[in-house]
């Protein structure tokens, strides 16, 4: 699951130039994966087939002698198993997403988890097999025809092997993880699914009860200042009531992770997430240094937005609040079909292949978008490896957030689609570059909306919508990183109390927003799902990387015109085949450890802020 940050956009029907109005289903097709839901006989057969493949793989690895041919055969089998596990995973997760909170899916997640654990043991043995070859022998093996396409991934596996403990200990750690790190992450889901709050609607004075997920959506999109503030106050109070439970969860999840990292030779809590994102500390430092150096540009923007919203103080809930009353312009909701047509059309301005892909995804029902009760909040894209397809989950309400979410997730899916002819291990791109393609797709759609504005008021609303992404990437995400870095530092010395977690988060928000918020959200550590994800530590800085990296690519796209598409696809196809620094150097000829590239992205934000301030002068 990947829960992605939404940007805001407004689609204008006047921009719809197509003569034929397509009608698309808003429910996805999961039956083409396994028909019949979670009771599908084909799903049951797949469980059995994958289990048998894992058993056979384990037998083969146990008796293997290191050679290029043996490594190639085992790699093929491992990738087949990985594809099967990935396909089962998206299927179960897909059904659980549209029937959120149903405990019937729990046994399936447990069964899937057991398969992953069973696969991990022989995979660790396979990694150690690679170490039995000396450097010269390994290099010769990688040069063979069958291994050449996956040589980068195999090299990473061989490096991983150097950290591994004995097989028995590694097997125990993986088994403990089911009731350790994974269990604590699932426990957080159970806690959050059971939370609700009551708020007062300022327009009619009525008290309304909503879930935690509904509250989060309303905090981003509620136009009434007082109602939004009421929800925020109740939201903070709700998470405060659960702080002992969520603090226990966060502490134990982090404790397991730190112990595991230490056992495997990691010297700091940042070493593993940087390794997972195939980037260096120097690149991370250069990126954050540019973010810090450019925060001041947001201050006049927030001051002007505070005026436009008519607020005495700017609170956490106001950072991406929509502008709904500017001049005589009134944003209108957009139908799903209109949003689809606009996305397809605008993708086509940069890449006909992107447009054709998006059209296919809508037509083949790869997207779950229907607004109905019982769905989990947020959005994600997951690949279906066995079918060489993708599935996209979101809830489309016609609001200013939702069409951009579709574009974002289609960007992810297009990225994955460019790799279907390559081995599965060439599809294992890291989160930081994964967020590049999705954010690039959003930029296309949002800039098209701004260009098509019919008045200054409309353009101002669209620019403000576009600003939600840089606010998230420069400020909100940085607050998460600063908190998590401080928390993991303190957690090494023992459990961190809820009160101290609040203090760390408040300090992180103060620093990240440079004092621009009058009212903060100290229980953000408790309310934000990303802190509780077991599979990915530091689920934050890759977003900022992806945003700024995509800004650089977008600038190149505008320069290259018709020559851009092939260059872009070539970059995407290399995302799992080299480090982030190597990717940037090869395809953009830039050095990510230096500030220049990152500053170019910040300069684009400054341009939007300058235009926002100039346009808004007449409305205050």
Task: Kindly give the residue locations of the regions a language model identified.
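Active-site recognition of the HExxH zinc-binding catalytic motif
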Residues: 265, 397-417, 438, 443, ...
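Long, K/E/R/D-enriched contiguous segments that form extended
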Residues: 313-342, 415, 467, 471-473, ...
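Catalytic zinc-binding patch centered on the HExxH motif and its immediate surroundings
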Residues: 329-334, 367-388
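Post-HExxH zinc-binding segment in Zn-dependent metallohydrolases
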Residues: 430-458, 466-468, 472, 546
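A well-structured
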Residues: 12-329, 614-620
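C-terminal, non-catalytic "cap/extension" segments appended to globular domains
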Residues: 4, 126, 130-133, 152-165, ...
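Short pre-active-site segment immediately N-terminal to the catalytic Zn-binding motif
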Residues: 331-334, 387-406
């Amino acid at each position: 699951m990947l829960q992605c940050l939404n940007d805001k956009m407004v689609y204008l029907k006047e921009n719809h130039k197509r003569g034929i109005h397509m009608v698309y289903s808003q429910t996805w097709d999961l039956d083409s994966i396994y028909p019949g839901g979670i009771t599908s006989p084909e799903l049951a057969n797949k469980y059995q087939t994958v289990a048998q493949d894992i058993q056979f793989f384990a037998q083969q690895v146990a008796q293997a002698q290191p050679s290029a041919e043996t490594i190639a055969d085992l790699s093929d089998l491992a990738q087949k198993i990985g594809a099967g596990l990935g396909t089962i995973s998206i299927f179960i997760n897909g059904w659980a997403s549209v029937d959120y909170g149903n405990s019937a899916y729990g046994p399936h997640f447990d069964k899937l988890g057991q398969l992953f654990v069973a696969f991990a043991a022989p995979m660790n043995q396979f990694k150690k097999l690679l170490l039995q070859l000396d450097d010269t022998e390994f290099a010769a093996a990688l040069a063979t025809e069958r291994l050449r396409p996956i040589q980068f991934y195999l090299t990473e596996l061989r490096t991983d092997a150097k950290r591994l403990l004995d097989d028995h200990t590694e097997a125990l750690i993986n088994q403990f993880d089911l009731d350790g790190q994974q269990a604590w992450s699932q426990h957080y889901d159970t806690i959050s699914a059971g939370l609700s709050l009551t708020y007062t609607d300022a327009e009619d004075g009525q008290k309304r009860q909503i879930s935690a997920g509904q509250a989060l959506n309303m905090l981003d999109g509620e136009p009434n200042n007082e109602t939004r503030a009421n929800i925020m106050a109740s939201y903070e109070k709700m998470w405060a009531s659960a702080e002992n439970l969520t603090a226990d969860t966060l502490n134990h999840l982090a404790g397991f992770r730190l112990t595991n990292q230490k056992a495997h030779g990691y010297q700091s809590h940042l070493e593993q997430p940087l390794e997972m994102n195939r980037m260096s500390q120097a690149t991370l430092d250069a990126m954050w240094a540019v973010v810090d150096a450019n925060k001041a540009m947001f201050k006049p923007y927030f001051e002007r937005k505070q005026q436009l919203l008519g607020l005495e103080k700017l609170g956490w809930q106001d950072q991406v609040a929509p502008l709904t009353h500017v001049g005589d312009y009134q944003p209108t909701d957009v139908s799903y079909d209109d949003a689809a047509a606009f996305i397809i059309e605008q993708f086509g301005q940069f890449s006909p292949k992107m447009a054709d892909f998006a059209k296919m995804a809508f037509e083949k029902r790869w997207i779950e978008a229907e607004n109905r009760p019982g769905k989990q909040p947020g959005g994600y894209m997951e690949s279906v490896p066995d079918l060489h397809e993708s599935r996209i989950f979101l809830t489309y309400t016609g609001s200013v957030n939702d069409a951009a979410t579709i574009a974002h997730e289609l960007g992810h899916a297009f990225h994955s689609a460019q790799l279907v002819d390559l081995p599965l291990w060439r599809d294992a791109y890291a989160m930081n570059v994964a967020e590049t393609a999705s954010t690039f797709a959003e930029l296309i759609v949002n800039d098209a909306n701004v260009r098509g504005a019919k008045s200054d008021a409309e353009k101002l609303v669209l620019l403000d919508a576009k600003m939600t992404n840089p606010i998230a990437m420069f400020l909100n995400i940085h607050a998460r990183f600063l908190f998590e870095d401080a928390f993991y530092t303190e957690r090494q010395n023992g459990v961190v109390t809820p009160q101290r977690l609040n203090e760390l988060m408040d300090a992180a928000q103060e620093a990240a927003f440079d004092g621009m918020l009058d009212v903060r959200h100290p229980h953000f550590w408790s309310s934000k799902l990303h802190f509780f994800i077991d599979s990915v530590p530091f689920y934050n800085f890759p977003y900022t990387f992806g945003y700024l990296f995509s800004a650089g690519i977008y600038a190149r796209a505008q320069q290259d015109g018709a020559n851009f598409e092939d260059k872009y696809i070539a970059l995407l196809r290399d995302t799992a085949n080299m480090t982030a620094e190597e990717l940037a150097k090869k395809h953009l000829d830039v050095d990510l450890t230096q500030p220049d590239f990152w500053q170019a992205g910040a300069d684009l934000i400054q341009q939007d802020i300058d235009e926002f301030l100039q346009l808004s002068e007449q409305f205050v």
